Amino acid sequence: MTTNDWITKLEAKMFDADIEAAIRSAYDCMAKNGGIYEKTEQACAASEQTLSGMLSKEQTDKIARYRQCAAAQMDCVSKYGFTAGLVNAIFCYRDTANKIPVNEETLIEQQISVDQSVEVRAAVKALTDECLTIDAGLQQELPGDLYEHVVSITCAWDERIHFSGIYGYYLGYRTALSMLRTLFPTASVIMEPLTLILEHHMGLNKTFEESEGKAHSK
């Protein structure tokens, strides 16, 4: 086995089925008990139930194909996000340690953008184009009240895809941070502001003001 073979094998092990399951589980946790995706998922489930039995076989097959393409997009962006987080954490540590300003939120969005990878961009574009074609076809075929339910379903998939990229990035970032601590024990302290901003960006934590506002609204 060559060195490249070992590297390929190692990369496959770093992002395996367990990581994919962890991303799905994290999303599911945020889609219930008042999580930020709860309303979107509730609307999606209600719309799927409403459409059940009301569509032709061809239309049902189109929605099934939409799900397949969207799920494949999730797979692409989560793996890419993991790699981006892994690499970006190292550069962010270097810049932060050297007191070079880092625009964290902009950096996060830029790093998970598949536009930076020709290969990933092409794969995601093909899947996105097919989803858009299916959606446009259903919009033409269905009356407005039924198509609204299709919109609820596609919105949920959009949220899942975006979260997969962000959470994949977060897992890669945390993996790199763990490695950095082995060499630089103060890495966690140096990177704490960026870590908190990243977690807030993902909806994993709230500012004190946000927590107070939520408590006051109850």
Language model regions located:
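Intrinsic-disorder/low-complexity detector
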Residues: 1-218
